[in-house]
């Protein structure tokens, strides 16, 4: 079982669905026994920190190294959104997706299932689609775009490879499925990943 994960990635990111892509590099740390993560992403313009720590979700964006232009936390919508991110990125540490008291799978058909996760008063779910190799193709849920707007949010892992004896996706794309269409805003490629190393890179 994986208890800790640390990874590095590169890729592209959009700060707004109507903005251009910017290059990004990041590193991320996960805990599994108690849900938690810290992600730090750097672009030429800003540094973003996304996290779920001590059962609280938080997003901080900084420019010029010291000026916080975004600091969002303290509401259940953000706690739920960041916990959804943690769960949606479990493909990088798939023992996290084994059935437990908190996590249940319900078959839908031969290639899809509902993943339910109950934790700290929050009830989350994903509709998960698999390919013929039983690799996750897509995870779909409802996530808050802001405090009041709940929309369809999709994680698409791909390019599966073996790392430390575990088959994981080395790339992932994230997008919103809105009535106007699908809007991708993050494309990450894992460049380094290690398990059960709780210390910082």
Where are these regions (language model features)?
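Short amphipathic beta-strand/extended segments with alternating polar/hydrophobic composition
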Residues: 47-56, 68-80, 127-130, 184-189
């Amino acid at each position: 079982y994986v208890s800790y994960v640390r990874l590095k990635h590169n890729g592209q990111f959009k700060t707004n669905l109507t903005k251009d892509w910017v290059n990004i590099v990041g590193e991320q740390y996960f805990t599994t026994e108690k849900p938690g993560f810290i992600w730090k992403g750097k672009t030429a313009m800003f540094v973003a920190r996304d996290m779920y720590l001590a059962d609280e979700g938080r997003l901080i964006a900084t420019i010029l190294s010291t000026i916080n232009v975004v600091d969002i936390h303290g509401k259940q919508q953000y706690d739920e959104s960041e916990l959804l991110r943690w769960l949606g990125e479990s493909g990088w540490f798939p023992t996290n997706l084994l059935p437990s008291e908190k996590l249940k799978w319900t078959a839908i058909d031969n290639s899809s299932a509902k993943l339910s996760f109950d934790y700290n008063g929050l009830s989350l779910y994903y509709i998960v689609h698999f390919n013929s190799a039983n690799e996750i193709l897509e995870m779909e849920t409802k996530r808050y775009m802001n405090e009041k707007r709940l929309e369809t949010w999709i994680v698409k892992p791909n390019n599966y490879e073996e790392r430390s004896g575990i088959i994981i996706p080395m790339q992932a794309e994230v997008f919103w499925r809105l009535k106007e269409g699908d809007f991708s805003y993050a494309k990450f490629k894992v460049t380094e990943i290690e398990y059960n190393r709780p210390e910082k890179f």
